Regions:
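Non-catalytic C-terminal accessory modules of carbohydrate-active enzymes
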Residues: 83-228
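Active-site core of glycosidic bond-cleaving carbohydrate-active enzymes
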Residues: 1-135, 145, 171
């Protein structure tokens, strides 16, 4: 697992709620980690250890702080590990909310807003992720969600995913860009077919097995239908 401390004098504590060594993955993945599968594996192992050691039997225990799970979930989505992200999301959804929808720091105690933004952020990032010039659809979709819809996701580059619907291998995304631009649209697997249903000036061109270059006009709703292999 990735280490928390530079000095060998300090031992990592996998039972602790903090995960400062996951900081590089809180919002996306740096290029040096993208290029190193072994490093990705070390980050993934840390998340697994934290979940197994600190968050085990979460249904019966109190005192665990919601922000720690948010951090693990954000890192898992950056790695594209859908099932690991889902493991983080389930207790986030079930443990830290009162009947009036107020969010808490510990299990049903201590009003706190960390999870109010953190839990939706993990969920959204599982379904839509973005970097400058890149929009990724369903980058960490768990098996528990074979179909679904999400609306109103704001992406980097002044792009909104107004609606994203998926059902098995069929994906439909409705996008609107505030400026004219070309972006790389990334699917969760190899693309069999893709089409642009509306949007004057919109066009797609080849890129990679699971991605296409998409030209977006300014201020126009563009519907993209994708069929995965």
């Amino acid at each position: 697992a990735i280490k928390e401390w530079l000095s060998p004098k300090f031992e990592d504590n996998y039972n602790h709620r903090h995960s400062s060594q996951l900081y590089p993955l809180f919002d996306g993945m740096p290029k040096e980690i993208q290029a190193d599968p072994k490093l990705q594996g070390a980050f993934r192992k840390l998340i697994e250890l934290k979940l197994d050691r600190h968050w085990t039997n979460w249904e019966k225990q109190g005192g665990f702080m919601s922000f720690g799970l948010v951090q693990l979930g954000q890192a898992a989505t950056s790695l594209g590990d859908a099932e690991l992200a889902y493991r983080c999301l389930v207790p986030l959804v079930n443990r830290y909310w009162l009947s009036n929808l107020a969010s808490t720091h510990n299990y049903r105690s201590l009003f706190n807003t960390d999870i109010s933004g953190g839990m939706p952020a993990v969920l959204i990032k599982m379904l839509v992720a973005s970097d400058p010039g890149i929009v990724s659809l369903l980058p960490a979709l768990p098996k528990a969600w074979p179909s679904g819809t999400i609306e109103g996701v704001l992406c980097r580059g002044q792009i909104e995913v107004e609606r994203l619907h998926w059902d098995g291998k069929a994906i439909q995304a409705v996008l609107r860009s505030s400026v004219r631009q070309e972006v790389r649209l990334v699917a969760p697997g190899p693309i069999q077919a893709i089409s642009v249903g509306n949007g004057s000036g919109a066009a797609v061109r080849p890129d990679g097995p699971a991605s296409r270059k998409l030209s977006l006009p300014a201020g126009v709703e563009v519907t993209v239908d994708v069929t995965l292999k």
